[in-house]
Amino acid sequence: MPIRIFSKEGLRERGASGKNEQKKKKKEKIRRSMKNLCRFVESYKDFTLYGYRFHSKIKHKFCVLSSSFPVLFFCHPLSPLKSNFIDRFTLDSHASQATWTLYMVVIVLFLSYRN
C-alpha cells in the first residue's frame, strides 16, 4: 500500500477551505432565518403592538414591543395560540394587566408542554 505524504501547506489549505465552507453555511442559515422575520404593527382597542414575529419549524416567537413593557412570547407551532394568542389573551395598556396576561400565557404554555 503506497504511503501518502502531505506537506503542511497542503493541510493548511484543506483546513482553511473547510472553515470557509462552514462560515458560508452559517451566513446562509442566518440569511434564511432573517427572511422569516417579519415586522408587524397591530392595533387593538386602547392598545397598539409594535414588534417582530419570527417563524421557524421548531417554535414561533412573538416579540411584542410597546410603550409600557417588552414581552417575548414562545409558542409551540402546533399550539392554537400561534395565530391568535393576542385575541385570546387581551393585552391592555396598563403594565399590571399586561403582566397578569403574561402569567396566564406562561401557565397555559407550561400546561400544554406537560402533555
Curated annotation (Swiss-Prot):
It comes from the Eukaryota. This is Putative uncharacterized protein YGL177W. Encoded in the first intron of MPT5. Residues 9-30 are annotated as: Disordered.
